[in-house]
Amino acid sequence: MRDADLLKKIFEEHEFLGVIHFAAKKAVGESCHDPFLYYENNIMGTINLLEVMNNVGLKNILFSSSATVYDAEKNIPPFTETDRTNTMNPYGTTKLVMEYILKDMVMHKQFRSVVLRYFNPIGAHSSGLL
C-alpha cells in the first residue's frame, strides 16, 4: 500500500467494484515499541490507497478497524458503535485516525465506506458476554 505507483497500475489494469482493506501492522506491543513504523505503514499506506482509489474513481471501501479504538477505561465490553473512543496504544490510534480519514472521504469525496471494529479473535471475554 505504500507504493502508490504500483497501486495505480493495479487499479488501472483491473476493474474493481470496491476495496476490502485489511492491510495493516497489528501487534499492540510492537506498536508501543516502534510507533513510527505503525504511523507510516498503517496511516500513510491507507492515505496512498485512498488517493489512488479517488484518482481512478473507485469509491467503495470496507475497512477493518479494531475494538482498540474504544475507551477501555470508560466502557465495559460489549461495546456499541456509540461508545466513546480513546485509544490506549499506537496501533489503536492508527485505526482511529484511519476511521476519521474515511469519514472525511465520505463527506467530501463521495466515498462509501463500511467500518468493522473487531474484538479479540483469540477467545471469549471472561464475562461470557462475548
Describe the residue ranges of each PLM region.
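Catalytic helix-loop patch of NAD(P)-dependent Rossmann-fold dehydrogenases
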Residues: 33-48, 55, 59-60, 69, ...
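N-terminal Rossmann-like NAD(P) cofactor-binding module of classical short-chain dehydrogenase/reductase
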Residues: 18-20, 62
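Conserved NAD(P)H cofactor-binding loop of Rossmann-fold oxidoreductase domains
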Residues: 23-26, 65-66
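Conserved Rossmann-fold cofactor-binding substructure of NAD(P)-dependent oxidoreductases
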Residues: 1-18
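Short, glycine/acidic-enriched loop or turn micro-motifs at the edges of active sites
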Residues: 2-3, 24, 120
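Helix N-cap/beta-alpha junction loops of NAD(P)-dependent oxidoreductase domains
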Residues: 4, 27-29, 72-73
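A generic secondary-structure signal
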Residues: 9-13, 52, 104
